[in-house]
């Protein structure tokens, strides 16, 4: 089960992902921050090269996830990159149309906090966070990926909110799979025939 934690800069995504990891959940840390810290590709110097490198690494990281039943939390998903292309009014690379959206079970859009914390990696402002959040939500919902908004509250409360929604979603998946199996057996003469 792959779950995206998304949202604009300085909304608390990394804190949430770190708390989830501390609880024993498998996580994929934000690729963009890693790329910026390396210093070779910087978004304020060449947004296209930066986004291309982030997407390449993101897809590699996601391809290495072999866990399908237990939740794996991603600090941003592949479609986050598309949102930045859209925001910057750059041509969206065709590779985004080849990414299977069904690999994501849920996306949590982390809403802004009452403060904004800029640093050497985060050079944007609160207006940017608000605008990119709208585009991020659209990039996921346009692919029928369920997006759940996580309101501003203490980080531990946000984690509880996310985990509660994940449990509810997991229960729904089990019921859906069981219902599909029952329907298949009822409709298929081969499935109901004794062997």
Region roles according to the model:
Residues 8:
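P-loop (Walker A) phosphate-binding loop of NTP-binding proteins
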Residues 5:
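Hydrophobic anchor at the beta1->P-loop junction of P-loop NTPases
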Residues 52-102:
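Glycine-rich phosphate-binding loop used to anchor ATP phosphates in small-molecule kinases
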Residues 89-159, 170, 174, 178-180:
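A glycine- and Lys/Arg-enriched "phosphate-lid" helix/loop adjacent to the NTP-binding pocket
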Residues 16:
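Hydrophobic positions on the alpha1 helix immediately C-terminal to the Walker A/P-loop
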Residues 13:
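Conserved lysine of the Walker
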Residues 19-60:
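Conserved substrate/cofactor phosphate-moiety recognition/catalytic segment
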């Amino acid at each position: 089960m792959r779950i995206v934690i998304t949202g604009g800069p300085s909304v608390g995504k990394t804190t949430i992902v770190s708390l989830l990891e501390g609880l024993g959940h498998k996580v994929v840390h934000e690729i963009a921050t890693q790329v910026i810290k390396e210093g070779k590709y910087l978004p304020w110097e060449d947004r296209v090269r930066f986004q291309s490198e982030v997407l390449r690494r993101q897809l590699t990281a996601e391809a290495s996830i072999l866990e399908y039943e237990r939740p794996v939390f991603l600090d941003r998903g592949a479609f986050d990159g598309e949102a930045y292309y859209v925001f910057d009014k750059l041509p969206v690379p065709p590779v985004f149309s080849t990414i299977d959206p069904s690999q994501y079970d849920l996306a949590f859009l982390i809403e802004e906090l009452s403060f904004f914390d800029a640093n050497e990696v985060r050079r944007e402002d609160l207006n940017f966070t608000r605008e990119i959040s709208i585009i991020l939500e659209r990039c996921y919902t346009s692919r029928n990926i369920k997006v759940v908004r996580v309101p501003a509250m203490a980080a531990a409360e946000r984690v509880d909110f996310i985990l509660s929604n994940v449990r509810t979603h997991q229960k729904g998946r089990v019921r859906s799979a069981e219902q599909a199996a029952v329907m298949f057996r009822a409709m298929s003469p081969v499935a109901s025939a004794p062997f």
